[in-house]
C-alpha cells in the first residue's frame, strides 16, 4: 500500500511509535527530557510556521518530517503524563513517610470485604502540609484497609478526612509473579493506608453536584445494599446476583469464579446486566431520534 496516498496512516505511525517508545524505552528516554512540553511546543510552532511557509516556497519534505517528530513526541507525552507520578502535584511529592498524614478523600468504589478486614479505594484531593500550614491539591489515589467494617461509615457521595500513615505497596521481586503494586498503579493508586478505628476516617460533608460516574457509583451501592439486606438468599447466591447486575465480583469465592472460567462465561461478570441494560437504553434512544 502506498502511504503517499494515505498520509494520515503514515502520520499515525509516528504517533503510535511515540506511544510504544514510552512503553518499552521510558527508562532510557525520560532522562533526556523528551517529556518536556517546551520541546514539543517549539516543534509544533515550527510545524505551523512551515505549513504557512510552504504556500510560498516548496517545503513539503520538511513539513512532513517536522509533523512526524511532533506526533512522535505527542504520543510519548500523552503516555508520560498518564502516569500521575510525573505530575508536580503527585501525592508522593507531598507526604512525609512514617508520619501521620491528613488527606481529604472520596470513595472511588464500594467497600470490599475480605476475611477479617475491609478495603476501600479512595480518590485523594488535598493533603495538609504542616510545614507550610496549608492544604495543597494532590493527585494519586489511596487504598484504605480497615480492621472494622467500613460500611458503617461509607457514603458514596461523601468526602472524608483520612488520618493515617501512607505506605507504598510492596512490589514483587520475581518478574514471573503477579505485581500488585503495578496493578494498583494502573488504577492510579500509589499508596496504602491501614486504619483501626472510625476516627481515622472522619465524615466531612456530602458532594453537592454529582457527575455521571458518581451517580453510577450511588446506583451500584444501592443495588448491592438492597441485595445484602433485603433478599432472602444465601451469601453465595447474593454475591452472584450482585456480580451479574453490577459487575462487582470482588467478594465472589474463588470456586465460583473458576466455575465461570471453566464454562467460558466469565465475561458475564465483567459486563453486568445493569451495564448491558444502560447500553441498550442508550442505543434505543439514539435510534428513536433517527427514526421515531
What are these regions (language model features)?
Residues 3-55:
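Membrane-embedded alpha-helical segments of integral membrane proteins
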Amino acid at each position: 500500500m502506498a502511504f503517499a496516498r494515505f498520509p494520515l496512516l503514515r502520520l499515525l505511525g509516528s504517533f503510535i511509535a511515540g506511544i510504544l517508545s514510552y512503553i518499552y524505552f521510558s527508562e532510557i528516554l525520560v532522562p533526556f527530557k523528551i517529556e518536556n512540553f517546551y520541546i514539543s511546543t517549539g516543534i509544533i510552532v515550527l510545524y505551523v510556521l512551515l505549513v504557512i511557509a510552504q504556500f510560498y516556497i516548496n517545503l513539503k519534505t520538511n513539513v512532513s518530517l517536522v509533523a512526524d517528530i511532533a506526533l512522535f513526541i505527542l504520543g510519548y507525552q500523552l503516555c508520560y503524563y498518564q502516569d500521575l507520578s510525573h505530575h508536580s502535584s503527585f501525592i508522593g511529592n507531598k507526604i512525609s513517610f512514617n508520619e501521620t498524614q491528613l488527606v481529604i478523600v472520596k470513595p472511588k468504589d464500594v467497600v470490599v470485604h475480605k476475611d477479617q478486614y475491609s478495603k476501600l479505594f479512595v480518590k485523594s484531593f488535598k493533603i495538609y502540609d504542616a510545614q507550610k500550614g496549608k492544604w495543597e491539591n494532590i493527585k494519586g489515589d489511596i487504598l484504605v484497609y480497615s480492621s472494622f467494617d467500613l460500611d458503617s461509615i461509607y457514603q458514596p457521595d461523601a468526602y472524608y478526612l483520612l488520618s493515617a500513615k501512607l505506605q507504598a505497596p510492596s512490589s514483587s521481586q520475581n518478574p514471573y509473579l503477579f505485581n500488585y503494586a503495578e496493578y494498583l498503579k494502573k488504577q492510579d493508586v500509589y499508596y496504602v493506608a491501614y486504619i483501626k478505628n472510625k476516627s481515622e476516617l472522619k465524615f466531612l460533608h456530602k458532594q453537592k453536584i454529582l457527575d455521571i460516574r458518581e451517580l453510577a457509583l450511588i446506583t451500584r451501592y444501592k443495588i448491592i445494599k438492597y441485595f445484602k439486606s433485603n433478599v432472602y438468599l444465601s451469601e453465595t447466591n447474593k454475591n452472584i446476583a450482585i456480580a451479574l447486575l453490577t459487575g462487582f465480583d470482588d467478594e465472589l469465592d474463588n470456586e465460583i469464579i473458576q466455575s465461570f472460567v471453566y464454562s467460558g462465561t466469565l465475561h458475564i461478570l465483567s459486563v453486568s446486566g445493569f451495564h448491558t441494560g444502560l447500553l441498550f437504553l442508550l442505543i434505543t434512544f439514539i435510534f428513536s431520534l433517527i427514526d421515531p
